[in-house]
Structures are given as C-alpha cells and as structure tokens.
C-alpha cells in the first residue's frame, strides 16, 4: 500500500525527513516557499561542532544525509577538543554553502519518490483528530497521510537591523504568513524566539597578514561512514582567528541603544549559548577580548563570515566596529548583520516520536520546536521522518534513549522540558557522554539502523569485518601478559598483568603498544583509539549501562495521554502538576522530568498495573 507524506520546508530538518521517508518507501511532497533556498545555510557555513558533530554522525549511521552532504562540500575539517577527553571531542567542517545547496538539489532530482513543490502552506487539513493534508496559499490542497512541519525561522519572521525592521525570512526571503496562526487556532501553544547573523565582508578588502591562521592538522576526518576519500590537508582552505579589543568594546557599549536587541524592538528570547557581539560585551564587561573566526562561505563567493560577531546594530555602527578589527581597516560589506525573530511551538506538545499530541500523523521538527542549529534540526527531521513512515506502515515506533544517542538526549529534553530560549545541544546535557562519543557511532546505532533497513550493505560488511579484527586484538590483550612482551618485561615489575589491564593505565596508548607486539593487527588508528578508550573507561560505562537498563525497562510501560494524575494515590502534588502539563508517553520519559522522583514513578506504575 502506498502512503504520501508532505514535508513543509526544505531546510536541514525538512531534507532529512524527506529523504529518510523516501528510503522507507513513502511518496514525499517536499513543499517549499522557494526552491532556490532548499538546503540553504543562512547563518554559519559549517556543519558540526561540540556535540553537534556527533549528532551529524549519528544521523549518518541512521541513514541520513547531512554527513554525506558535508563531506561532499567540505573546505576544511577540524577535530575539536583534541587535547581534551574523548567524551567532548567532535568534528566540525567548514563547508561550501553554495555547493551544499547544489548537492541536495541533485539528490532530490535523482530521487524518484520526492517531488519538490513550490508553494506556501497556510493550514493543516484535519478530520477526526487525524491529519489529512495541507492547504496552500492559492487555495489548493495536498492530500497526505502524514505531514511534517519543518518551517525553520520562517513563521511570521521579522528581521531587525538597528531601527529598521522588515517582515521577511532569512536572507530577505519570503516569510510564512498564516501557518502559525492557524496552528494556534488548533490549540498549539506558541512562543517567540530570536536569533541573529553576522555581517558578510568582501575578502579582497581584508589584510589577512594581521590575522592568526587556523588550519587543520588532523588528517583523515569525515562525518560519513560511506566517505571513501578524505580531503587531503594540503587541499583544505585556511580560516583565520582575530579578537575584539577594548576600543571596540567601548564603541559597542556607547551605542547599545541603537541595537535592536537593546532598544526594545525585539521582545523574543535569543540563544543563550550564541549571543550577539553586543550582548557578549554587555554581559561580560570584565573580558578584554572575544574571539572571532573569519571563515570563507564558498569557493564561488568573495565573502567571509565572522563567526562570533552576530549583531543587530544599524549599518553605520557595524561599519565602525568591524573596521576596528585586526585586518579589517578597509573592510567592505556585502551584507550587514541582522537579528531575526520568529514563531516556534512548545515542544512538550510532542511525543518522543515528534508526532504532535493534538493531531495524529502531524509531526514537528527543527527550529519550530525551539531548537537552534543545523544539526539539531537535521536530527529531528530524521527521527520525525522515520516515525512518520513506521506509523503509516503499522510498525513499532523508533525512539532513542538518552544513553543511546545525543539524538535521544535532545528529543527527551524537548518533550519533557519547557523551552524558553533556543535550545542548543551541549556535551554537558548528556549525563552519559563517556558512551555517546564521536568514535563509537556504529557500535551504538548500526544494528538499530539495520533493523530499519537503512544501512548500506558495504558499510555493514566493513563494520562486521572491523568488529572481528577488534575482537582478535582484545582477545590477545586479555590472554597475553606484560612478561610475554620482550620490550615490556624489563621495564615493568608486574609482569603477570595482562596487556588488557596494562592498557588501562592513563600513560599507556594502545596505538603505541601494538608496535611492540610480535603479532600484527590490521586496524587503523581510529579503531585502535576506540579500543583504547573502551578499555580505559569500561568501568564507568558499565555503571552507566546498569543505571540506564532500569530506565529502559520503564520505557515499555506506556502511559495513556488522558491519564488523570489526580486519581493516582500517593503521587506528589508537584508531580501531578508537571505530568499533567507534559503528558509523557511512558514511565522512562516521566522519570526524566525535573522534580519527579522514583516514588512518583512507582506510584504511577502501581496505578497502571491495577487499572489496565
């Protein structure tokens, strides 16, 4: 039986939703305001970063597109936090944003069951609490078995640059006028959020000799496990690093009231972890400088992006400030920075599948849920697309737990916690970040992906081969002692210790140890490092697994959406209020809600057991 899905929006969330649903057999209508903006990167020309880069790789293991697109259009890679522990390391890629868009358009053209449609969605068609399609601005209708709304920052969007404001989307694009109004009429709770972007400067007007070079020094980096050819270090573009100075800070503070963020024009909440330059200078007046990265946007563009310098100052103030930066004395502007506010919707109105609780087969993904970032959006689009397909095909839902993926952490946060400012994924949000690492994506997720039919055969075959090689090395380490290795027995007293336990020492690196072994193992550096990390952190990871095993069992206990918590004996009043508002779908989700303790969970479980 054939099913049709309509995805509203062709940004990072919409694209993942469309492609994964098409892979799972659905016919997809990809409805966009402007086909020329499909896959656009209206803010930073980069994919990845702390936690975010791990999400991009999780998306890849689960059959998604973002990692492949980034690898196909990368200009430079970096392994972030390489000097720190493995839990916080992640890949970030500078991408060619024009090539990135072209890559996605080519993929759409080559996918028969995705139809790109230009039009504006103004309302949802609904019957008996179930979505039936989409109403377009011209009065036409798209019949659909499911709908995923991925409207990004376009809902009633408004841009600000000084005292000037315009009703428009990012990059002067047409905004979505009516959809959020009609969703509100259907009972959805909205909130107003804000983000911003820096000015774009013509690179030929800059003196790069006054800037520090930021080059990649780590070879063999890629997001996707399907990427065969790594971008050579010598072919990677150079980014630059500069800093603000006290003179700039004085100018910013003297002109604060000209910024739309400070003059009262903008009422919406902005991102806590990505503030504007004026906000940073105002909030951290004890800091003498703030770092700014100068990044190319595309090989086909003459502009650079000032990462860390988003602003809503008027053009003349932006010019004065920017020209005080090192190397920017003669800077010429291609586009001024601006702030943008938009409608989003409270994500606690969603199930863990990202289906709305109010209307069946209607899903929200991306910035409409109050998140920020391309990676967060793409991850939600992927999960929404998978679950839309599974539900229509009457298959079990796909929900990742907090100990399985950053995607699980993010979605659990979204559906259990009220969002007041744009949500950004951070390693600190993951209580089990020692397990949710950049190096063990396949071990965590590939079998789940294979169960969905989303893993390429050659990728899975290579994974099994690598697992067998890893097992051979681990078996050797567990059965061989220090005393059996000539290069070790003279330098270490405990010769009866196995090499496995010997590797647990912080100063021992497995990549060096294998060079001393008489037996050779055909494993690359990445695989050796992963084994090394697993050995060193095995104790911590075991504790983590034991703790979450109890929560995973709770996920099998479903909670009726209409449960009257006032009727649950011995349930704390705080739990009644919070659970009545959030409406968790199972006990595992309920246990993650702030203020809910184990006794509350036991009370609910006992009540459900006696009222089946």
Swiss-Prot record:
One GO molecular-function entry: flavin adenine dinucleotide binding
Main location: cytoplasm
Binding site for FAD: 9-14
Family annotation (Pfam families): GIDA, GIDA_C_1st, SAM_GIDA_C
Entry keywords, A to Z: Cytoplasm, FAD, Flavoprotein, NAD, tRNA processing
Protein localization: Cytoplasm
Coiled coil start-end: none
Function of the molecule: NAD-binding protein involved in the addition of a carboxymethylaminomethyl (cmnm) group at the wobble position (U34) of certain tRNAs, forming tRNA-cmnm(5)s(2)U34.
Family membership: Belongs to the MnmG family.
Protein name stated in the entry: tRNA uridine 5-carboxymethylaminomethyl modification enzyme MnmG
């Amino acid at each position: 039986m054939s099913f049709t899905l309509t995805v509203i929006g062709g940004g990072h969330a919409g694209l993942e939703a469309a492609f994964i649903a098409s892979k799972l057999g659905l016919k997809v209508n990809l409805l966009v305001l402007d086909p020329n903006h499909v896959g656009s990167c209206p803010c930073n020309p980069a994919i990845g970063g702390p936690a975010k880069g791990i999400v991009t790789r999780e998306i890849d293991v689960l059959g998604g597109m973002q990692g492949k697109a980034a690898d196909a259009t990368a200009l430079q890679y970096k392994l972030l936090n390489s000097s720190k522990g493995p839990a916080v390391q992640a890949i970030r890629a500078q991408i060619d944003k024009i090539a990135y868009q072209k890559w996605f358009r080519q993929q759409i053209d080559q996918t028969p069951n995705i139809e790109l449609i230009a039009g504006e969605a103004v309302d949802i068609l609904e019957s008996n609490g179930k979505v039936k399609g989409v109403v377009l601005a011209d009065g036409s209708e798209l019949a659909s078995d499911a709908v995923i709304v991925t409207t990004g920052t376009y809902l009633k969007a408004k841009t600000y640059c000084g005292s000037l404001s315009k009703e428009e989307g990012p990059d002067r694009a047409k905004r979505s006028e009516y959809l959020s109004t009609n969703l509100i009429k259907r009972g959805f709770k909205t909130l107003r959020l804000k983000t911003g972007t820096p000015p774009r400067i013509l690179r030929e007007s800059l003196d790069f000799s006054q800037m520090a070079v930021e080059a990649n020094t780590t070879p063999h980096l890629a997001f996707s496990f399907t990427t065969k050819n790594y971008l050579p270090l010598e072919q990677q573009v150079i980014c630059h690093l500069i800093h603000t100075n006290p003179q700039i800070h004085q100018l910013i503070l003297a002109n604060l009231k000209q910024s739309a963020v400070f003059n009262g024009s903008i009422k919406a909440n902005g991102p806590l972890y990505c503030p504007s330059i004026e906000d940073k200078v105002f909030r951290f007046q004890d800091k003498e400088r703030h770092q700014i990265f100068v990044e190319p946007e595309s090989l086909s563009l003459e502009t650079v992006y000032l990462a860390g310098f988003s602003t809503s100052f008027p053009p003349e103030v932006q010019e004065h400030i920017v020209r005080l930066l090192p190397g920017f004395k003669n800077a010429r502007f291609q586009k001024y920075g601006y702030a943008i506010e938009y409608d989003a919707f409270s994500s606690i109105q969603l199930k863990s599948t990202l289906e709305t609780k109010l209307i069946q087969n209607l899903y929200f993904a991306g910035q409409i849920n109050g998140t920020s970032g391309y990676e967060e959006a793409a991850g939600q689009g992927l999960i929404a697309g998978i679950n839309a397909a599974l539900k229509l095909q009457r298959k079990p839902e796909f929900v990742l737990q907090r100990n399985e993926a950053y995607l699980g952490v993010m979605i659990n946060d979204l559906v259990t916690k009220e969002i007041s400012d744009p949500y950004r994924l951070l390693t600190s949000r993951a209580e089990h970040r020692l397990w949710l690492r950049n190096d063990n994506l396949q071990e965590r997720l590939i079998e789940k992906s294979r169960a969905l039919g989303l893993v390429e055969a050659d990728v899975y075959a290579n994974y099994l081969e690598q697992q067998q090689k890893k097992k051979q090395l681990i078996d050797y380490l567990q059965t061989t002692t220090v005393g059996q290795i000539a290069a070790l027995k003279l330098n270490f007293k405990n010769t009866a210790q196995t090499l496995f336990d010997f590797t647990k020492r912080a100063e021992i690196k497995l990549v060096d140890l294998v060079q001393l072994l008489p037996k050779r193992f055909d494993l690359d550096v990445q695989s050796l490092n992963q084994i090394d990390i697993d050995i060193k952190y095995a104790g911590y990871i075991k504790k983590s697994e034991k703790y979450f095993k109890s929560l995973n069992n709770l996920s099998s206990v479903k909670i009726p959406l209409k449960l009257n918590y006032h009727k649950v004996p011995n349930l704390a009043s705080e739990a009644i209020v919070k659970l009545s508002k959030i409406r968790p779908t199972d006990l595992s989700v309920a246990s993650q809600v702030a203020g809910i303790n184990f006794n509350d969970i036991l009370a609910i479980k006992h009540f459900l057991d006696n009222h089946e």
